[in-house]
Amino acid sequence: MATIRNQRFSLLKQPISSILNQHLIDYPTPSNLSYWWGFGSLAGICLVIQIVTGVFLAMHYTPHVDLAFNSVEHIMRDVEGGWLLRYMHANGASMFFIVVYLHTFRGLYYASYSSPREFVWCLGVVIFLLMIVTAFIGYVLPWGQMSFWGATVITSLASAIPVVGDTIVTWLWGGFSVDNATLNRFFSLYHLLPFILVGASLLHLAALHQYGSSNPLGVHSEMDKISFYPYFYVKDLVGWVAFAIFFSIWIFYAPNVLGHPDNYIPANPMSTPPHIVPEWYFLPIYAILRSIPDKAGGVAAIALVFICLLALPFFKDMYVRSSSFRPIYQGIFWLLLADCLLLGWIGCQPVEAPFVTIGQISSIVFFLFFAITPILGRVGRGIPNSYTDETDHT
């Protein structure tokens, strides 16, 4: 028995297995982590689901403007289990964004972006941006009405970039309009970007493990930690089961609710839909874009969203991190969450009064959050940065 045990531990000391053991088994984790810290592993599961289903769908998809729509219908009707693959992939994108949005708002609530985890947060923002680009490209591939016109509207935004804008649009289109060359470009990129996402996710994980996970109290301690396995594997397993049930409800009972009915109409360049709406997870950003009448101003506002997110960790460090001890910031946080939900609703409304005005006010409120956060970070003092720090700062 002792020999078997020694062999087991010697296997964990091998080059590759020792890395896995260090980061997935013996990784020191704060003992007070709540279920809100389980969305990182769920995001990894979503990414794996998207890659696996995407590879199998690509085996039956034809990237040609005359055949793309029919090839998707062929997958749904003729390929055994094709309907399940497509619904898993389409709804999996929505689940991925739900998980990442919750993961991000948890980071905002508990100030997980603060020192020394600035690089972790910045990598997370890059991952979010890559997800948006990948999801947009994937939405174009079925070549329905909303796919075609969404591609036309969104890619044309690049023309607002000074000097090189028109060149970028022509390169994206592969011609003078969205056509077969565009679809082929997007199909190629759609199978490259997920693997870039995997690389960015591994960097995100490595950066996290450099300083360790934060915790609900927002304080640091090297003593109050336990190994990730088996304690948090079991805790994450509860989240995985709940996620599987939630995901299954959408796949089997409401597979098309999160999509748009116009995308079941083949793309027609001669017929513009009455209202061009992106997928629901783009709606808050889309609302900010539409709230500014000028195209260049709208693109600048979108760029400012990501600049604010990237700059957030570099604001002056705060005395108290967790919102549990910052009632003023807590109120501002819930206002931001409500504002993002309102922006999501505005994004799917027609561009007319009063929706434009509401969108402009909501956009201002969104950016005010990032302007106020550095000020609130200096308000309040009474919790040490570490359990072992002196609590008397006088």
From Swiss-Prot:
InterPro entries: Cyt_b/b6_C, Cyt_b/b6_C_sf, Cyt_b/b6_N, Cytb/b6-like_sf, Cytochrome_b, Cytochrome_b_C_euk/bac, Cytochrome_b_N_euk/bac, Di-haem_cyt_TM. Binds 2 heme b groups non-covalently. Pfam families: Cytochrom_B_C (PF00032), Cytochrome_B (PF00033). GO terms for biological process: mitochondrial electron transport, ubiquinol to cytochrome c. It is found in: Mitochondrion inner membrane. Heme b b562 binds at residues 89, 191. Heme b b566 binds at residues 103, 204. Keywords: Electron transport, Heme, Iron, Membrane, Metal-binding, Mitochondrion, Mitochondrion inner membrane, Respiratory chain, Transmembrane, Transmembrane helix, Transport, Ubiquinone. The chain crosses the membrane at residues 39-59, 83-105, 120-140, 186-206, 232-252, 296-316, 328-348, 355-374. Its cofactor is heme b. GO terms for molecular function: metal ion binding; ubiquinol-cytochrome-c reductase activity. It is a multi-pass membrane protein. A ubiquinone binds at residue 209. GO terms for cellular component: mitochondrial inner membrane; respiratory chain complex III. The main subunits of complex b-c1 are: cytochrome b, cytochrome c1 and the Rieske protein. Belongs to the cytochrome b family. Component of the ubiquinol-cytochrome c reductase complex (complex III or cytochrome b-c1 complex) that is part of the mitochondrial respiratory chain. The b-c1 complex mediates electron transfer from ubiquinol to cytochrome c. Contributes to the generation of a proton gradient across the mitochondrial membrane that is then used for ATP synthesis. Heme 1 (or BL or b562) is low-potential and absorbs at about 562 nm, and heme 2 (or BH or b566) is high-potential and absorbs at about 566 nm. This is Cytochrome b.
